C-alpha cells in the first residue's frame, strides 16, 4: 500500500511539472502587442515596395458639350412657330472643358502599355500619366471597350518602367486579404486594405458585362483603373466602381478579375477592340424557386430557355431546358457571370460547359464565334450620329422603327438631341422600319440628317450636320 502511494505521488508531481513547464512555454511563445507591431513580418511595406512602382496616376483633359432643352411648358404651338420662324433651336448647346482623374497599372514595361478603365479616358483629348517617381509623360489610347470598362493606353519612349506580376483570379476565395492602390481625389499613390467580400458580382449596369470582385478595401473617386493585389503583390483585379449613396466610400467596391482583364487586353492589343463572342442562348438566373420546379438540387447556374438556330450552342448540342453549371470546370454563379465570361474570350476559343440535363451532368465542348450584331454602333456607319447604340424596335414581331438604346454624353448623337429610348421612324423623309433601311440612307453619305423621332408622347425633328 505504501509502495502504491509513493508511485501515485511521483506521477502526480511529474504531471504538475509538465503542466507548469507547458504553461511557461506557451506563455513565452505568445508575442506582446509591441512585438507584434514591431515585427516586419506583419507589415505590408515589403509587398508595396514591389507593387507601387507599377501603379500610375492619370489626369485627363477633354471637351464636353452640354445641351439644354427649352422647358416643355414653353413649347406651345405658337412658341414653336416663333422659334422656327427665327431659326432658333429648341435644344441649346454650349462647349466646355472637363478634367478627370484616375489610375492605371503597367502591364508591359517594354512597350509602355498601361491598363485602366474606359470611363477614365473617355472623350480625352490629352492624357497625362504620372509614375510613382513623380515623372510625368503623355499617353495615347490604343483601344477601349465601354461594355467591359477596359482601356489600354501607351506611353511614348519611356524606359525603366516596372510592370506588375499577375495572379490567377480563378483561385480567389471570399475572405482573402487584398490591397487597393490608386489615386483617390488626385492625392497620388494611396494604399488601403481589406478582404474579398464576394465574387461574381453583377447588376450594377445591365447594359454592360459584369463579373466583379467585391471588396471592402477603401476605393474612392480617382481609384478607377488602379490595382487590387494579393499579399504576394500580384495583380488580381482592376478597381472599377463603388456603390455609394453620396460619392464616398462605404466599404463596397468592385474590381474586374485579372483573368478577364487579360482576355480583353489581349484582344485590344491584337485587334484594337474586343470582338464579342456569341454562345447563342437565351436564358435566366437559376434560383431556388426555379430549381424546385425543375426538381433539381442545384441552386446556381444559367437556365437555358432558348437556343438560337445554327449558333455555337445549337451546333454543339445544347438544348432548351439545360442548366449550365460549369464553365471550364469552374462553377457558374449566375447567367450574368456566364454572359460576361463568354463575351470576354477571344473568338474561336473552345470552352467546356458542364450541362445539367435530366439530373445528370454532361460535358460539352463549344467553339465560340464572333457575335452577329443585332445592334449597330452608329460611329461605324455615320459620324453625324456617332455615340449612339441602335437596335430594331419591334411590336408584335414586326419592325416598327429604330430604338436608341443609349447615348454617350458629349458625342455627336448627344449634341443632335438623341436620347435613350427615342424611336427613329423617319430619316431624311425616308421611312425607316429597321436598321437595314437606316443603313441604306447612311450609305448615301448625307451631309445632313433630319431625324423624325418619337419620344414618349411627343414627336419631334432632330437635325445634325
UniProtKB/Swiss-Prot annotation:
<keyword id="KW-0645">Protease</keyword>
<feature type="signal peptide">
    <location>
        <begin position="1"/>
        <end position="26"/>
    </location>
</feature>
<keyword id="KW-0574">Periplasm</keyword>
<keyword id="KW-0677">Repeat</keyword>
<feature type="active site" description="Charge relay system">
    <location>
        <position position="149"/>
    </location>
</feature>
<feature type="region of interest" description="Serine protease">
    <location>
        <begin position="102"/>
        <end position="240"/>
    </location>
</feature>
<feature type="disulfide bond">
    <location>
        <begin position="85"/>
        <end position="91"/>
    </location>
</feature>
<dbReference type="InterPro" id="IPR009003">
    <property type="entry name" value="Peptidase_S1_PA"/>
</dbReference>
<keyword id="KW-0378">Hydrolase</keyword>
<feature type="active site" description="Charge relay system">
    <location>
        <position position="224"/>
    </location>
</feature>
<keyword id="KW-0732">Signal</keyword>
<feature type="binding site">
    <location>
        <begin position="279"/>
        <end position="283"/>
    </location>
    <ligand>
        <name>substrate</name>
    </ligand>
</feature>
<comment type="function">
    <text>Might be efficient in the degradation of transiently denatured and unfolded proteins which accumulate in the periplasm following stress conditions.</text>
</comment>
<dbReference type="Pfam" id="PF13180">
    <property type="entry name" value="PDZ_2"/>
</dbReference>
<dbReference type="InterPro" id="IPR036034">
    <property type="entry name" value="PDZ_sf"/>
</dbReference>
<dbReference type="Pfam" id="PF00595">
    <property type="entry name" value="PDZ"/>
</dbReference>
<dbReference type="GO" id="GO:0004252">
    <property type="term" value="F:serine-type endopeptidase activity"/>
</dbReference>
<dbReference type="GO" id="GO:0012501">
    <property type="term" value="P:programmed cell death"/>
</dbReference>
<feature type="domain" description="PDZ 1">
    <location>
        <begin position="268"/>
        <end position="359"/>
    </location>
</feature>
<dbReference type="InterPro" id="IPR011782">
    <property type="entry name" value="Pept_S1C_Do"/>
</dbReference>
<dbReference type="InterPro" id="IPR001940">
    <property type="entry name" value="Peptidase_S1C"/>
</dbReference>
<dbReference type="InterPro" id="IPR001478">
    <property type="entry name" value="PDZ"/>
</dbReference>
<protein>
    <recommendedName>
        <fullName>Probable periplasmic serine endoprotease DegP-like</fullName>
        <ecNumber>3.4.21.107</ecNumber>
    </recommendedName>
</protein>
<dbReference type="GO" id="GO:0043065">
    <property type="term" value="P:positive regulation of apoptotic process"/>
</dbReference>
<dbReference type="Pfam" id="PF13365">
    <property type="entry name" value="Trypsin_2"/>
</dbReference>
<dbReference type="GO" id="GO:0030288">
    <property type="term" value="C:outer membrane-bounded periplasmic space"/>
</dbReference>
<keyword id="KW-1015">Disulfide bond</keyword>
<keyword id="KW-0346">Stress response</keyword>
<dbReference type="GO" id="GO:0006508">
    <property type="term" value="P:proteolysis"/>
</dbReference>
<feature type="domain" description="PDZ 2">
    <location>
        <begin position="365"/>
        <end position="457"/>
    </location>
</feature>
<comment type="similarity">
    <text>Belongs to the peptidase S1C family.</text>
</comment>
<feature type="active site" description="Charge relay system">
    <location>
        <position position="119"/>
    </location>
</feature>
<feature type="binding site">
    <location>
        <begin position="222"/>
        <end position="224"/>
    </location>
    <ligand>
        <name>substrate</name>
    </ligand>
</feature>
<keyword id="KW-0720">Serine protease</keyword>
Amino acid at each position: 500500500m505504501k509502495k502504491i502511494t509513493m508511485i501515485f505521488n511521483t506521477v502526480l508531481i511529474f504531471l504538475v511539472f509538465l503542466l507548469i513547464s507547458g504553461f511557461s512555454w506557451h506563455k513565452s511563445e505568445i508575442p506582446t502587442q509591441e512585438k507584434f507591431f514591431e515585427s516586419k513580418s506583419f507589415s505590408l511595406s515589403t509587398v508595396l515596395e514591389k507593387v507601387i512602382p507599377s501603379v500610375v496616376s492619370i489626369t485627363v483633359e477633354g471637351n464636353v458639350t452640354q445641351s439644354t432643352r427649352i422647358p416643355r411648358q414653353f413649347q406651345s404651338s405658337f412658341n414653336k412657330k416663333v422659334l422656327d420662324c427665327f431659326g432658333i433651336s429648341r435644344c441649346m448647346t454650349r462647349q466646355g472643358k472637363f478634367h478627370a482623374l484616375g489610375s492605371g497599372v503597367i502591364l508591359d514595361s517594354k512597350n509602355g502599355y498601361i491598363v485602366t478603365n474606359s470611363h477614365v479616358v473617355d472623350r480625352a483629348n490629352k492624357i497625362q500619366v504620372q509614375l510613382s517617381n513623380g515623372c510625368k509623360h503623355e499617353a495615347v489610347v490604343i483601344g477601349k471597350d465601354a461594355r467591359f470598362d477596359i482601356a489600354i493606353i501607351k506611353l511614348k519612349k519611356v524606359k525603366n518602367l516596372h510592370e506588375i506580376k499577375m495572379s490567377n483570379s480563378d483561385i480567389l476565395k471570399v475572405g482573402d486579404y487584398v490591397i487597393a492602390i490608386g489615386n483617390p481625389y488626385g492625392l497620388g499613390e494611396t494604399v488601403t486594405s481589406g478582404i474579398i467580400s464576394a465574387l461574381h458580382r453583377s447588376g450594377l449596369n445591365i447594359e454592360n458585362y459584369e463579373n466583379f470582385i467585391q471588396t471592402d478595401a477603401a476605393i474612392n473617386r480617382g481609384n478607377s483603373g488602379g490595382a487590387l493585389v494579393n499579399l504576394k503583390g500580384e495583380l488580381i483585379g482592376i478597381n472599377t466602381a463603388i456603390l455609394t449613396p453620396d460619392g464616398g466610400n462605404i466599404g463596397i467596391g468592385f474590381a474586374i478579375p485579372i483573368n478577364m482583364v487579360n482576355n480583353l487586353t489581349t484582344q485590344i492589343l491584337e485587334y484594337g477592340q474586343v470582338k464579342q463572342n456569341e454562345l447563342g442562348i437565351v436564358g435566366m438566373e437559376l434560383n431556388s424557386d426555379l430549381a424546385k420546379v425543375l426538381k433539381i438540387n442545384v441552386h446556381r447556374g444559367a437556365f437555358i430557355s432558348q437556343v438560337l438556330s445554327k449558333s455555337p450552342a445549337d451546333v454543339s448540342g445544347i438544348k432548351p431546358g439545360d442548366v449550365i453549371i460549369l464553365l471550364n470546370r469552374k462553377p457558374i454563379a449566375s447567367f450574368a457571370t456566364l454572359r460576361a465570361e463568354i463575351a470576354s474570350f477571344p473568338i474561336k476559343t473552345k470552352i467546356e460547359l458542364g450541362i445539367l440535363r435530366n439530373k445528370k451532368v454532361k460535358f460539352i465542348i463549344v467553339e465560340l464565334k464572333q457575335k452577329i450584331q443585332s445592334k449597330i454602333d452608329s460611329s461605324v456607319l455615320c459620324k453625324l450620329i456617332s455615340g449612339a447604340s441602335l437596335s430594331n424596335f419591334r411590336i408584335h414581331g414586326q419592325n416598327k422603327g429604330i430604338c436608341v438604346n443609349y447615348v454617350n454624353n458629349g458625342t455627336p448623337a448627344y449634341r443632335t438631341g438623341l436620347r435613350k429610348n427615342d424611336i427613329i421612324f423617319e430619316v431624311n423623309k425616308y421611312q425607316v422600319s429597321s436598321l437595314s433601311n437606316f443603313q441604306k440612307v447612311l450609305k448615301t453619305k448625307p451631309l445632313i440628317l433630319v431625324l423624325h423621332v418619337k419620344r414618349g408622347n411627343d414627336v419631334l425633328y432632330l437635325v445634325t450636320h
